[in-house]
């Protein structure tokens, strides 16, 4: 039997049948706007802000387990001159949400070029086999935040090996786990 992708593991679920969870971090932009945020929301924002500031001109950025692509607004304002952003996620629903929420203006995916000064795209796939959908040596900067804890250890290890495959020789990686 194939393992399932689930939103989150609930009481009574057989964990051996779960491939990964797709539960996402809260949208810290909305949390701050509404005045209801936690230390975790602040930590997530700081991590994303730090990663955006590390991005340099000409870089191809890959956001591993991108969820709703909360990196995009920060990259737009703080990562001047990057070449591209590619978000990778195993969940079609997460990618659809990322595409819908890519701007406050709710642009259609085909109109993102008018809003972002770099190429924006998403890839659906398992990060444990990421080099099947992202060319080896493509990424100049890999951002991998708050995701390893959502998958089995073997897949987590495989995903790190896959990150190295898609990274260019001088690439950077921003990796975090809560």
Predicted regions and their residues:
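Class I (Rossmann-like) S-adenosyl-L-methionine-dependent methyltransferase catalytic domain
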Residues: 1-54, 58-59, 64-131, 174-178
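A short acidic, Gly/Pro-enriched loop at the edge of an enzyme's catalytic core
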Residues: 132-142
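A short beta-strand submotif of the Rossmann-like class I SAM-dependent methyltransferase core
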Residues: 144-147
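A short His-aromatic
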Residues: 149-151
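A short glycine-rich, Lys/Arg-flanked "PGG" loop and its adjoining helix->strand segment in the class I
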Residues: 157-169
């Amino acid at each position: 039997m194939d393992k399932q992708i689930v939103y989150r593991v609930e009481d009574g679920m057989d964990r051996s049948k779960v491939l990964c969870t797709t539960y996402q971090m809260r949208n810290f932009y909305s949390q701050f706007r509404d005045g209801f945020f936690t230390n975790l929301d602040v930590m997530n924002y700081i991590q994303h802000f730090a990663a955006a500031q590390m991005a340099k001109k000409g870089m191809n950025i890959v956001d591993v387990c991108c969820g709703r692509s909360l990196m995009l607004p920060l990259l737009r304002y703080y990562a001047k001159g990057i070449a591209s952003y590619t978000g990778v996620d195993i969940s079609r629903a997460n990618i659809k949400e990322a595409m819908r929420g890519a701007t406050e203006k709710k642009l259609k995916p085909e109109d993102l070029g008018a809003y972002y000064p770099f190429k924006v795209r998403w890839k659906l796939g398992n990060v444990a086999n990421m080099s099947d959908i992202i060319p080896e040596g493509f990424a100049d900067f890999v951002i991998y935040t708050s995701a390893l804890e959502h998958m089995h250890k073997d897949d987590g290890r495989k995903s790190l090996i896959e990150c190295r495959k898609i990274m260019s020789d001088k690439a950077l990686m921003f990796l975090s786990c809560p």
